[in-house]
């Protein structure tokens, strides 16, 4: 489980140290292999096993389903396998850093089954734009059984 948020930095070589708490979560059954994929304003980081499960669900859709093809072209095709180095870092390719605006200061946020890496400034803007009472959200989620 990935919970919480952590301030970190991307070094000039594009390496990012994964928080110890998240490394522990990966070690509990997931190992040191992850899948990274840029999505919107963030870089998603998925445990390899959970990514494989996602791919299987997508592959379970009819072969010519337009949604299947779109998610394969626009999302899955961008995914890249990455292994944590002995210091617990991942290497983020330059084009991925550019795509989601990762320069130096980042926020790593846990989203239960995955985590995301955000440029700190973009995250602050996102938070401001989505700030407010959560009562309506919690009510909608309760209606969905959460």
Where are these regions (language model features)?
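Acidic/histidine-enriched, glycine/proline-rich intrinsically disordered or flexible terminal extensions
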Residues: 130-146
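Short, charged/polar, Gly/Pro-enriched secondary-structure boundary elements
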Residues: 52-54, 123-127
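Short, solvent-exposed interaction modules
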Residues: 53, 59-90, 94-97
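A short beta-strand-loop micro-motif that forms or neighbors metal/cofactor-
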Residues: 28-43, 79, 101-118, 135
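Short, charged/polar surface micro-motifs in flexible loops or helix N-caps
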Residues: 41-43, 50-53
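Short, structured motif recognition centered on aromatic/hydrophobic residues
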Residues: 14-18, 88-92, 96, 115-117
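A positional/architectural concept
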Residues: 2-43
